[in-house]
């Protein structure tokens, strides 16, 4: 089974917050285990970029972006297509969730893999059976 990351999961790992070890374990599996992937929407990668830029500056954000885009991180990046955008927009229309998060949910649904997150907005979608979630600790 592979996994999908949202920005919460990647930021947890990058900032070495509680749950970072769990995210790193998935990344290690994607490096060493054939058929295991860590899917990330480019939209969520952009969210990580702007949050890193604000917290740690352009240099670190740029380095992360380049590492991810050049394949130096074991992330399977997924581009938004018109179909994916429409599916994400439909989720946003129905649920009180940030628009960027709808791309992570849509991707997890499409790939039929759990979403690794600690974002409390996702609880409702999990309760309604829209996706399986691997819960990371929520940050204080």
Describe every region a protein language model picked out.
Residues 2, 71, 75-78, 105-140:
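Acidic, PIN/NYN-like endoribonuclease modules and their adjacent C-terminal/linker elements
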Residues 69-93:
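Acidic catalytic patch
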Residues 50-53, 109:
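Short glycine/serine- and small hydrophobic-enriched flexible loop segments
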């Amino acid at each position: 089974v592979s996994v999908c990351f949202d920005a919460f999961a990647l930021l947890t790992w990058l900032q070495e917050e509680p749950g970072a070890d769990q995210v790193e374990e998935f990344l290690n599996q994607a490096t060493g285990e054939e058929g295991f992937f860590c899917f990330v929407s480019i939209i969520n990668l952009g969210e990580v970029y702007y949050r890193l830029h604000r917290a740690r500056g352009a240099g670190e954000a740029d380095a992360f972006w380049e590492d991810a885009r050049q394949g130096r991180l074991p992330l399977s990046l997924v581009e938004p297509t018109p179909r994916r955008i429409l599916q994400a927009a439909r989720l946003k229309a129905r649920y009180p969730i940030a628009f960027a998060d709808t791309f992570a949910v849509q991707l997890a649904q499409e790939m039929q893999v759990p979403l690794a997150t600690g974002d409390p907005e996702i609880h409702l979608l999990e309760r309604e059976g829209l996706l399986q979630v691997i819960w990371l600790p929520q940050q204080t």
